[in-house]
Each structure stands twice: as structure tokens, then as C-alpha cells.
Amino acid sequence: MPDLHTLPAGSRPERAIRNNGPSDLALERYKLRELAEGWPCYRDACEWENLRSIFHPDAHIYTTWTGLTHHLQFIEASKTGMDNGVFIMHRIHGSTTDIDPSGVRAVTKMKATITQRFSGLPCVSGGTCEADAESDCRFIFFWEKLDGSEYPELDQQWRARFVRHWYEKDKLIAVTAGRDPVIDLEKLQQYPPGYRHLAYLQESTMGVKVLLDLPGHRREGSTVNGQKHDLFQEYPMLHGCNSYKDNRGFPTTLKSIALREIRMKYLFDVI
């Protein structure tokens, strides 16, 4: 078991404002909480226009079933999935925000549970049954307050440039007591503990290939998921998301960067 209580050096940006601070920045943090909580509230209710209003026009996100994708592609994939019977909901538990002193960059960490209903599963007692796979996560939002130079209509609006999830703990719940789904336990163990049942059933029922190297909890230690949590590597600094882009127009260094590193660099090195 890794040392869970000594966080990696630099994991807490010393110049970030959080918890109290100036009233004007507290108001900005409140705005960011409202935006972050909009993801699950708007997506689950199919309020697509409201969901789009959270993101920068060139924002990208990462999920188990889409991988790295543009937010508009994620919305279209969500619509298609819903039309095909995919039933994903979210529960919000709380959030914190680190904001830079100038009030133009911020990072929000939102605790939430992703819960997906799977129907028509083979049942241990015969027939079929339903089950909910749930993963407790941290949604990490990287915000920029736009100055209107590129998008005048968005002047002084906060928009998410990038969103990624840390998958920390999951479980499988039978919808009806005594009606448990048949599980291939050997295959199940091939998936990461933070989203094991979710990944197992997404691959089994949705025809997708789930990414297996997404960030997990620190207790996962030397596994790829534990390493992604604490990954430390050198990379070009993010500068307005306009440099160091790959062939999909996205900064290559954001694909697997550590939370502690990107928080510090995003908040301060580009100011």
C-alpha cells in the first residue's frame, strides 16, 4: 500500500486561492461550481444547449467509453447512445476550486458518482435482469475566463478547456434483490478497480473498447492507473491551448498528464 497521507510534492499550488479568500474570487468559484455541476444535470436531462454552454468551442474531454474526444462529438455520441438504450446518470457530492489570483484560470475538482443501468443481462437464477454499475469519481475541470479576443460573444465567460475523470471506486448493484447478473469473474479482474464493473459491462453490452489506463486512486500504487494518478513528466507548457497540438488539434501533453502537474502549470505558468 502506498503512503496515502503524504501527497506528491507540488500537489497543492501555494499561490492558488481556495477556501475563503477575497469575496470577488469566492464569487468566481461559485460560478465555476455551478458550471461544473451543470455537466451531470444538463446531460442527464438532455439539455444539450445548456451543456454546450459549459465548454470552450475547442474543449476536449476524456471518458471510459469515448476516450479523448471533442465535447461536441461527446454530446452527439451521448445522444446516439441514449437512442440505443444507454442509460447513464450522475450523482453530485461536492466540489472544490483552485483559482489563480488574477481570476482568469481555475481548476475544479468535483466528486460525483457515474451510475449506468444495464438491462437484459443473463441472470444467475435464470432469465434476464438489470444491474447498476457505479463508479465514484473526481471530475477535473480546467477553466479559462475568456477575454473576447477570439470569441467576442463569450467575453468574460468562464468555459471549460479540458475535462478529465479520476475513477476511484466502483461496485455492481442488482436492481432487484435476488436477481443477480452472471459475471465472468476471470474477465472482470482484467479491468481497473476504479471502474471495473462499469468497464466490464460497457464492453459487454455497448460494443465499445474501454480504455484501461485511466487515472485511479493512489492506493492502486504501481498499477498503470495508480501511476496515472501521480504521473510526473516533462512537457511543453499549456499556452492558451494553441500550441503543441496533435493531428486532432489537441495539446498532446494533456492526454495523460498528472493532476498535480497540470493544476500548477495551468493555473500559473501560463499567466
UniProtKB/Swiss-Prot annotation:
Disordered: annotated span: 1-20
InterPro entries: NTF2-like_dom_sf, SnoaL-like
Pfam families associated with the record: SnoaL_4
Source taxon at top rank: Eukaryota
Family assignment from sequence similarity: Belongs to the PEP2 family.
Protein name: Uncharacterized protein ATEG_07673.1
Organism: Aspergillus terreus (strain NIH 2624 / FGSC A1156)
Source lineage: Eukaryota, Fungi, Dikarya, Ascomycota, Pezizomycotina
